[in-house]
Amino acid sequence: MRGVIGKLNWASREGMPQGAGDASLLASKMPTPTVEDLTEANAAMRRLIANDVPIWIRAIPFEDLSLVVFDDASLANTKGGFAQIGHIVCACEKKIHTGQRSPVSVLLYKSHKNPRSASSTLLNEATGKSEALADSEWVATWIGLCKDLEYDMRKRHLLNREIKIVSLTTNHDNDGLDLASITDAKSLFDNLMQQQYTGAEKRAALEICVIRDSLESLGGRVRWVPHDRNPADCLTKLRKR
């Protein structure tokens, strides 16, 4: 089991984001895995071997460069009842903001257990999005340094606005998920779209303020996409064998 998980971790870390969720979730089963866990690990390894997906880095002019980030959070599916959160940060062309198709380059991805004990799915979703935007700010700052040697990181909240990031979230359907997951996922989107935090717990409301601040510093906005169209979904749950 340790050997299989080690291979999964190495492959996903070096350039196979489709296996990052499996690797992280299976690693949380140690040091007391079950036979079912071993079966899941072997199935995950077979999927990676059978699906060799290249990561393309597209040539996008600096003046047309933008970012898009996909994020997702699960509910109590890791050891100890913690949530799994994950995100993918991609480079794209600015025309994606107007609904047009755009070439996309995966720059950064991450899947891990939520280190915070969250009392609601809304807080899990908010924590995942906040972390995704933090990595997006890091990428945007790196791009700013590449474009201008005089880039002042102390003014990144102003200079990064030209990136105009798009942050996408999902509202899960009810296939195998409880009603709370559906409601809270939509609640995050609703709370980001309005000024008042209707029904939001205080910690989640504070995290939403952080998200709004990150979106403002990146000149960004949040959008909603269906569960089955979110590429970050595979980062937060084990796929079926």
Feature-to-residue mapping (PLM):
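Contiguous, well-ordered alpha-helical segments that form the cores/surfaces of helical PPI scaffolds
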Residues: 3-13, 21-28, 69, 75, ...
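C-terminal reverse transcriptase regions that engage the nucleic-acid substrate
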Residues: 1-53, 226, 233
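RNase H-like nuclease fold core
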Residues: 68-122, 139-141
